[in-house]
Amino acid sequence: TGIIAQSTEDDHFIRYNANDGVLLACGGFPGNPYMMEQLDPLGTSVTTACSYSPSDKGYGIRAAVWAGANLDKEAAPMLFDRGIVAPGVDAGYVDSESAFGGKAFPGTIRQYNPGTQPFLKVNRNGERFANESSPYNDIVYAAAHQPGRVYAQICDANILEDVKRFHTIGCSAQTRNAGAEYLQKQMDSAEEKGCFFKACLLYTSDAADE
């Protein structure tokens, strides 16, 4: 049996057989903290902000499992390195009375596109911990082993020239293609929310060169 449906004309039930199985397309479960913590504890722990659809609560998946469907043993989330938070804020869920399940991610900036650019990234101790030119997922998961599971991105006044030189591909190319005005708006918005800071003085050291 592939599916049992109910007619809208006379309410009788119809059975459709599926010899090769059923592929169910019903969305994911990023809007359900219970399922997120149970099925993807690592991905959940390194997430600072999420732009999911609130309706993605995994109800279709739960119904399918109840009916006997197989569920992947490991979750396969696509995490982007663009959810930014203020200093001192850890990655992972925080309590939220207004959110479904009473939990939400702390960040309100979910798509800071320049975050994907391979600028220097350091943990809370000022230590570089990963290859900044790695794909979206890699730098985020590398942060799982750092204090608070977060990091800081450091750039200078040559940011736009550097972005052009990096010439990243995929959706991260938006920062390069959109130009100076777009980049400035992104930085200004982050600064207003306490997530982006302009340095007044810079000091060099042997450690920075290393």
PLM segments and residue spans:
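Conserved beta-strand-loop-beta-strand element in the redox core of flavoprotein oxidoreductases
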Residues: 1-15
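Short, glycine-/Ser/Thr-/acidic-enriched flexible segments
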Residues: 8-10, 21, 28-30, 125-128, ...
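Glycine-rich loop(s) and the adjacent beta-strand/alpha-helix scaffold that form part
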Residues: 16-89
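Rossmann-like dinucleotide-binding core of oxidoreductases
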Residues: 50, 61-153
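Predominant activation on well-ordered alpha-helical scaffold segments within soluble catalytic domains
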Residues: 58-65, 155, 184, 205
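Glycine-rich loop/linker segments at domain edges
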Residues: 143-202
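Conserved small/polar residues in nucleotide/adenosyl-binding loops
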Residues: 203-209
